[in-house]
Amino acid sequence: MPVMKGLLAPQNTFLDTIATRFDGTHSNFILANAQVAKGFPIVYCSDGFCELAGFARTEVMQKSCSCKFLFGVETNEQLMLQIEKSLEEKTEFKGEIMFYKKNGSPFWCLLDIVPIKNEKGDVVLFLASFKDITDTKVKITPEDKKEDKVKGRSRAGTHFDSARRRSRAVLYHISGHLQRREKNKLKINNNVFVDKPAFPEYKVSDAKKSKFILLHFSTFKAGWDWLILLATFYVAVTVPYNVCFIGNDDLSTTRSTTVSDIAVEILFIIDIILNFRTTYVSKSGQVIFEARSICIHYVTTWFIIDLIAALPFDLLYAFNVTVVSLVHLLKTVRLLRLLRLLQKLDRYSQHSTIVLTLLMSMFALLAHWMACIWYVIGKMEREDNSLLKWEVGWLHELGKRLESPYYGNNTLGGPSIRSAYIAALYFTLSSLTSVGFGNVSANTDAEKIFSICTMLIGALMHALVFGNVTAIIQRMYSRWSLYHTRTKDLKDFIRVHHLPQQLKQRMLEYFQTTWSVNNGIDSNELLKDFPDELRSDITMHLNKEILQLSLFECASRGCLRSLSLHIKTSFCAPGEYLLRQGDALQAIYFVCSGSMEVLKDSMVLAILGKGDLIGANLSIKDQVIKTNADVKALTYCDLQCIILKGLFEVLDLYPEYAHKFVEDIQHDLTYNLREGHESDVISRLSNKSMVSQSEPKGNGNINKRLPSIVEDEEEEEEGEEEEAVSLSPICTRGSSSRNKKVGSNKAYLGLSLKQLASGTVPFHSPIRVSRSNSPKTKQEIDPPNHNKRKEKNLKLQLSTLNNAGPPDLSPRIVDGIEDGNSSEESQTFDFGSERIRSEPRISPPLGDPEIGAAVLFIKAEETKQQINKLNSEVTTLTQEVSQLGKDMRNVIQLLENVLSPQQPSRFCSLHSTSVCPSRESLQTRTSWSAHQPCLHLQTGGAAYTQAQLCSSNITSDIWSVDPSSVGSSPQRTGAHEQNPADSELYHSPSLDYSPSHYQVVQEGHLQFLRCISPHSDSTLTPLQSISATLSSSVCSSSETSLHLVLPSRSEEGSFSQGTVSSFSLENLPGSWNQEGMASASTKPLENLPLEVVTSTAEVKDNKAINV
């Protein structure tokens, strides 16, 4: 196979880098998607993490990066929040935390979470490293802890720092930021001016190399190789010539080539240095850039030969060092560099011209060597027969022809060295190419033997070079010829169809890479003529990696043999898409080497590595399976694929295994590519969520139920709406101390409008309120009754108002409890959170049916969090409503003091029987009674008679009030009242008369009233619900605003001592119904007393809540 450049395409080697750096320390790490704001699902987990946690990879994938599935009872909640915060803010986290394995056993873990960025600087992944430090924790005894407290905090953190140093050294070493400094301690380079990131980036990057590393296919290296090739030819020519023709006799002659010889030796030495910094192609086809690997490779291959060839023998002559003749023979070792010529033949074998040129050069070099040998043989024959005066050697014959014979016992005279070399070369070439011409012939036995050998070599070389060059190349390099033929066809195809450069590069690279993998051999074509038995055994051996998966453990040998015939090998280059979203899935793929990523909408859903299985679960129906995501190669990947068509055929032949295979494949798939698989995932997730809500279990799950809202959208039956129900009895409200004893931390607020003339207006707004000051909920106190009450649909129906009599329009205060009979069977509002949490998940997913499982899971999590957030807001709202209820109770107590029944014959039926009331009868009561409400107002600075107070025209002048609005919106202008500390006294700054049953008390410059009515009743409390609110427009004027003073109550129902706050009704929220709203007169009330009498009114609040 021809020597190629190697695999040089840009690769995303992030996964390989992480795995390589962790190798040798601990490989417990996971990768999570940082682009998904909710959940940060795990896209890759190492085998070490699966072994540490006890979970399978399929169980870990797509779970949250916060590792909630590892939390347990003793897991620190503060660290949980810190992990969540670091993930949300995409910052680094490090700390020791207690985790729990799948079997429930705890272990201490040193957790490091690091954000990974892409080439744009965006955080796309989280790298979480897990280090088991349980053994280190166990070694710390209580005594050691006491000693640590005495000696300081430095020793207490020794185990933590040492474990962290070992763990984080791996992460920082990934980008080369780990430096070894003095005392062999590992320290972090915190130089802020360093541009390199502290951790590897998740991106496609070119192969990195040092500035001093030479590419073996670079232009400079190619030119240098040609220079070394010429120097090698020079050595191959000069070394034999100097050894045979020069010798030690004429040193002056040897000096003529000394300079060139030294220059060649210098070139060889430089070549050795460059070879230590030149890349090479490994057996797997990868280009090696690491200097250490290059050095090891060169030392174990060509270093020894190059070193011997570079020994400076010619320097001995340069310094006039006398050496023996054997030293010249050592220079022949340089001829071993000719073996490098074979590499050139491999590299340039696709160029026939270069190959023929090199072959001719080798033929000429061989003739040169044989000419040198021929001269040595003639010289030895002359020296051996010098005493016998033989003159039959080829040198004697040459001397005679050239008229320069030998004399002086054949030691002097003779032809020149130049003439002798030319004659010898002529003889060898004529002998190699033909039988010779006879002008130079062999005369002695030694010469004849050499001539025979020359003829034999000549015949072989002649046939090789001149006769059978094409045939020899086809026989020896048939695979090369096929490779070049296909390469040429591919280039012609590209040229004819005018394909773009990028597509051309992809095609050529894919062809070269696949050729390097299978060497151009089509295994199917090669094995088709073999019997099925032998072919099955061969394919089982070739595909043993995928057949060793747990998925095929239950398959019989016959099933595996049949299945192996339908397995094919595939190759994917970096950046190539194996599958695209919406494609018909034709096979199930097994990753043998390399790494891939699953993409959807440019978002990483999973990262696949060696040993991962991708495909789809099989359906009972024979239908086309569409993929729901793209599968893209990050590096060069070798794949094995099971063709689905053949798989179905095998499963039909082995039905006993088919059922098991269909069940197991959905668990063994690292990522399921079936379109619509997300619906099943969400269904399973919802079921798991419901189980976890009803029966919380697992390690460290926070089983806290949050309050929720369930909107009851069912309509009331028409008959029930029209049915008149008697008014529910109203119970007195217990004191604050009694409420504390009950300890109920859940109040249920139910509001209902009274049934007016238009009919009952039902509305449903049950709100579940949680109070934090109670130790137990009402459900915990009475579970049986709670379950009964939970099944009932609470509806408060109030009877229709009787127009004949004055209606009770007293506002009701919401305290969250409707206790009509003061019994345990009273109905309360209770709504479980399981229903609202499960209904959104059980419903079919909306939107694009091809949405990924991870996206739907994230949406489900978002919905869950939004519901929890809504529940939290509702909890806060109900607390505010409860507080508002307390304020409204105070307002109602205030209204009790100003409302009294309307009687035409007397002003106040309870305090006086006279037609015109006395001053005592104008004072408010301390408790609520069932008579009609009345309002007493004493304005400052004016005195009126009793007749004037009872006169209706005064009332109409002061208040221009619609009677329908008086009962719901009383307004009064009065002065601030104060309760003195000694008794129940109420101060009015300009009190000119004293009502009946009230005693005037003078203290200093102030006047106070004491209630002495015998009819005082404190057994009843205000109504506990209110459906009407005050209009801000009515209360906006300062002239019409009413400042009411409410004395507080004690436990016994009397007014407590102390300062009583003043409430202004203009600050209360809400609005009046326009039909019942009164327009208050803007006439100043400074000098007039006021009487406001309520009357029957039909009140309808259009803004009431319908549930």
Curated annotation (Swiss-Prot):
Its main location: membrane. Residues 686-702, 961-972 have a biased composition (Polar residues). InterPro entries: cNMP-bd_dom (IPR000595), cNMP-bd_dom_sf (IPR018490), Ion_trans_dom (IPR005821), K_chnl_volt-dep_EAG/ELK/ERG (IPR003938), K_chnl_volt-dep_ELK (IPR003950), KCNH_animal-type (IPR050818), PAC (IPR001610), PAS (IPR000014). The chain crosses the membrane at residues 226-246, 256-276, 299-319, 328-348, 358-378, 449-469. Residues 247-255, 320-327, 379-419, 441-448 are extracellular. Residues 710-724 have a biased composition (Acidic residues). Primarily expressed in the nervous system. It comes from the Eukaryota. One of its GO terms (biological process) is potassium ion transport. GO terms for molecular function: delayed rectifier potassium channel activity; voltage-gated potassium channel activity. The keyword Transmembrane applies. It is a multi-pass membrane protein. Residues 93-145 form the PAC domain. Residues 18-90 form the PAS domain. Pore-forming (alpha) subunit of a voltage-gated delayed rectifier potassium channel that mediates outward-rectifying potassium currents. Elicits a slowly activating, non-inactivating and slowly deactivation outwards potassium current at depolarizating voltages from -30 mV to +50mV. Shows no obvious change in the activation rate from different holding potentials. Activation is strongly dependent on the pH of the external solution. The potassium channel is probably composed of a homo- or heterotetrameric complex of pore-forming alpha subunits that can associate with modulating beta subunits. This is Voltage-gated delayed rectifier potassium channel KCNH8.
